């Protein structure tokens, strides 16, 4: 008898999970704008550069707990993120120019 009750318990849990999944599917998803994503990416690049600059200043001042390898890693991360941002901008400008040169 306890095996049947265990199976019924599992079935009721599965039904509850299925109902909650259906309820979540019916909720409207927030819209994500291109401009918002671009702004967020630029903010992340800026934050990375600020963190690297702060880390370098701490190392220069001789604060304990700041190692040279951490500073160099942060500086490289900032450099790579900046280069990525520049390349994305270049691709966006090229795409814009291509669209503007199309004849209607």
UniProtKB/Swiss-Prot annotation:
Gene Ontology, cellular component aspect: bacterial-type flagellum basal body
GO molecular function: cytoskeletal motor activity; structural molecule activity
Disulphide bonds in the chain: none
Location, primary (coarse class): other
Keyword Protein biosynthesis in annotation: no
Subcellular location: Bacterial flagellum basal body
Sorted UniProt keywords: Bacterial flagellum
Gene Ontology biological process terms from the UniProt entry: bacterial-type flagellum-dependent cell motility
Homology family: Belongs to the FliE family.
Entry-linked PANTHER family: FLAGELLAR HOOK-BASAL BODY COMPLEX PROTEIN FLIE, PTHR34653
Protein name (database record): Flagellar hook-basal body complex protein FliE
Species name: Escherichia coli (strain 55989 / EAEC)
Gene that encodes it: fliE
């Amino acid at each position: 008898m306890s095996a049947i009750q265990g199976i019924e318990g599992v079935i009721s849990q599965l039904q509850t999970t299925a109902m909650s999944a259906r309820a979540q599917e019916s909720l409207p998803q927030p819209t994500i704008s291109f401009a918002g994503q671009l702004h967020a990416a630029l903010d992340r690049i800026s934050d990375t550069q600020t963190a690297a600059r702060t880390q370098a200043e701490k190392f220069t001042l001789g604060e304990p707990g700041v190692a040279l390898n951490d500073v160099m890693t942060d500086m490289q991360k900032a450099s790579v993120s900046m280069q990525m941002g520049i390349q994305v901008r270049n691709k966006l400008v090229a795409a814009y120019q291509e669209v503007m040169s199309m004849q209607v």
